[in-house]
Amino acid sequence: GDLTVRYVPGESDSLMFGGNSNWRGPVWFPIAYLIVEALERYHHFYGKDFTVELPTGSGRHVTLQGAANEISRRLTRLFEPDATGHRPCHGSYDRYASHPAWKDLLLFHEFFHADTGRGCGASHQTGWTALVARLVRKS
């Protein structure tokens, strides 16, 4: 049969590798953070004359630092409340947006749904997901 690798934005929908095969679509903070750092370092070397199209197909070109800033902004936005108090990282759990005791709580999930930003996996993954603090500090 045909072998394919499909894009899966959240939890794995396959039993490959025992069901733990969700490394090909979701947002993983350690990888995203390393990409931001790499783009910043390459910008330091190549400077403002080296640009990339962002987003692809848009015709808009930015420096590598600009690309790093955009990725950082997207990552930090996962934790920012909208006008109604909902944060993408909390998905559809209204309690975190409306309940006074919960509305300021941030859960540092293991990984995030690439299309919606909803936190997936362990909700107490304060280790690598806490890298968002470094991104906030840099901005």
Protein language model annotation of sequence segments:
Residues 1-139:
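Acidic, mature catalytic/reactive cores of soluble proteins
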